[in-house]
Regions:
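Charge-dense, helix-prone N-terminal extensions
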Residues: 1-3, 16, 46, 55-56, ...
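Hydrophobic ligand-binding cavity/cleft-lining segments
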Residues: 1-37
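Hydrophobic-ligand binding "helix-grip"
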Residues: 37, 53-99, 103-106
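Hydrophobic pocket/interface hotspot
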Residues: 18-19, 28, 46, 60, ...
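Residues at helix-coil transition
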Residues: 23-24, 65, 124, 131
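A conserved amphipathic terminal alpha-helix motif
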Residues: 104-148
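Short coil-to-beta transition motif at edge beta-strands of beta-rich domains
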Residues: 40-45
C-alpha cells in the first residue's frame, strides 16, 4: 500500500482554528469544495462534490478536538475506496502543524500523482482560510493539469 503525505504549517496560536476548519461543513466548504454536506460526528458521513467530476463520501472515524481528524472513503473513484485520510495537528509556538496522510492506495497510478498535488493545493487553501479568512475551495482552486 502507498500513502500521500504532506506537512503544512499554519500561523495560528491555537490548533482549535484549524480543527474547526476540518470538522464543520462551513469550514470544509471554505477550503476544499464549496459543495460539502453531511454530519461530521464519529460514524457520520460527509459528502464532497466537485461539479460534474463527481466526488467522495467519507465516514468519520475519529475526531479528537484540536488533535486529529480521520475519515474513511466509502464512495467515490475506485482508487479512493477504503483509503483513509487523516489530519494530525501539533502546536509549535504560534504555528499549528498539519500532518496530512491519505493512506492505502493500492498502486501509484497517474490519478494518485494528480491527487497528491491537489491535496497540496487544498492544504494551502486551508492555510489561507485560517490565516487570512479566505480559502480557495473548488471551483476556485489552482488548476494543475488538463483534467480540470
Amino acid at each position: 500500500m502507498l500513502d500521500i503525505l504532506h506537512k503544512v504549517g499554519i500561523k495560528s496560536s491555537s490548533p482549535n482554528d484549524v480543527y474547526k476548519a476540518l470538522t464543520t461543513v462551513d469550514g470544509l466548504s471554505n477550503w476544499w469544495t464549496d459543495d460539502t454536506q453531511g454530519e461530521n460526528q464519529v460514524g457520520g458521513k460527509l459528502e464532497f462534490r466537485f461539479g460534474g467530476r463527481g466526488g467522495f463520501d467519507m465516514k468519520v472515524l475519529e475526531l479528537e478536538p484540536a488533535e486529529r481528524v480521520r475519515w474513511q472513503v466509502v464512495d467515490g473513484p475506485e482508487e479512493w475506496i477504503d483509503t483513509k485520510i487523516s489530519f494530525d495537528l501539533r502546536q509549535e509556538g504560534d504555528w499549528t502543524l498539519v500532518y496530512f496522510k491519505h493512506e492505502g492506495w493500492k498502486e501509484a497510478v497517474d490519478f494518485m500523482h494528480h491527487c497528491s498535488t491537489k491535496w497540496g493545493v487544498f492544504l494551502l487553501s486551508l492555510k489561507s482560510l485560517v490565516e487570512a479568512g479566505k480559502g480557495a475551495p473548488y471551483p476556485n482552486e489552482i488548476k494543475i493539469d488538463s483534467w480540470e
